[in-house]
Amino acid sequence: GLLTALSLCNKRYPHPMFLIDQAERFVFKPLLYELLSSEMTTNQVWPRFTELLNCDTVTFVQGRVAAIDLDKQEVKLDSGLSYSYGKLVLTLGSTANYFGIRGAREQTFALRDGNDAIALSQHLRARLQQASQTSDRQQRQSLLTVAIVGAGPAGIEMAATLGDLLPQWYRKLNGDINEIRVVVL
């Protein structure tokens, strides 16, 4: 949606456009691992739509589409607001793929936005803290093993990022970095 709006704006499309999204911020998903590692800031990886839209003909509307009336050419939001259109572009986004791996949905963090990256960072740091304080080798091994579901570009990038980050974080807790395992499924 954002790319379409910006492209039309750059081509000087003369008609008013509405970009409707349920989130306030756009997510550069391939860069979420950079937010996790603090190599980039929240605003770089997860900027507000309003900051990206420097175009007089595009208006950002935060909301969730409840219905589309094709006959009336109207988009209705769950807030009760509705918007008329002459042309409609639907961009529905994506969903996480767990590749049929049992338990993956329930036992993993989906990395979909900045909040997910922050939650994952906090979770990993808490596990490292726990591991540094336990003398039980088996429990420590469990705490220091991270599995990544998905061996595509994002999964491999995440594995590489965690392979760098976790030892840095664990070293600060005086932990043995050789005990850390990052596994890609």
How should these model regions be labeled?
Residues 1-62, 66-67, 147, 153-185:
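Beta1-alpha1 glycine-rich phosphate/pyrophosphate-binding loop at the start
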Residues 57-147, 165:
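FAD-binding core/adjacent interface of flavoenzyme oxidoreductases
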